[in-house]
Amino acid sequence: MNTARLNQGTPLLLNAVSKHYAENIVLNQLDLHIPAGQFVAVVGRSGGGKSTLLHLLAGLETPTAGDVLAGTTPLAEIQDDTRMMFQDARLLPWKSVIDNVGLGLKGQWRDAARRALAAVGLENRAGEWPAALSGGQKQRVALARALIHRPGLLLLDEPLGALDALTRLEMQDLIVSLWQQHGFTVLLVTHDVSEAVAMADRVLLIEEGKISLDLTVDIPRPRRLGSVRLAELEAEVLQRVMRRGHSEQLIRRHG
């Protein structure tokens, strides 16, 4: 990992965090510590609590119980240090690419926006409209929009899910490269276990609102696609997910 990082990531500490929607318990007294600058991927079946966890960290929702901290400080108090990317790039079609990157900023921000676009390989598209961009290019703009704020925490909610296979691999490499350069903490939610293992330091499996697997990805970078160790770790996570699904089917069948 590159030690010459530009900024320090946000350390995260969740203590007995729960989130309820009426009688539905989505997160159930979840405990989690993520050191500053770590890249963590969260996987699991739909409805297990992955996106809810991300929304709590982004300040889009509040926990029913428990504490969400950045070190010893409530994360909500430093929310400006957090940026989030979604599957939809959410660009404003009536604003140019560079204006989308600088959205909400005041003062002399255009040079910083150009640097952010250069970092994602789009320095020559600054004056164009979002409609002229491919899906992968739109996500690069969304990434540049996050970078310009020099975040301590980058939250990724399935940002690559709608991309074709080659573009997806290119974006994976770009995100990892920028993470290594800048040192922010990353939390990636994905349904793609191979993506999680390829990108992250650590993979969490959330089931029924709790962390049921916390797996360290002990593979040096850069990682070689198709390596035996990557395949072994991917299989370990998938077997755990499938075992839980098989158990639920047996319960329904014999209950």
Swiss-Prot record:
Q: Domain ABC transporter, which positions?
A: 12-233
Please give one Gene Ontology molecular function term for this protein: ATP hydrolysis activity
Question: Keywords for this entry?
Answer: ATP-binding, Cell inner membrane, Cell membrane, Membrane, Nucleotide-binding, Translocase, Transport
Q: Which InterPro entries match?
A: AAA+_ATPase, ABC_transporter-like_ATP-bd, ABC_transporter-like_CS, ABC_transporter_ATP-bind, P-loop_NTPase
Topology class, membrane: Peripheral membrane protein
Q: Which residues form the signal peptide?
A: none
Q: Name the family the entry cites.
A: Belongs to the ABC transporter superfamily. Aliphatic sulfonates importer (TC 3.A.1.17.2) family.
Name-wise, this protein is Aliphatic sulfonates import ATP-binding protein SsuB
Protein species of origin = Shigella flexneri serotype 5b (strain 8401)
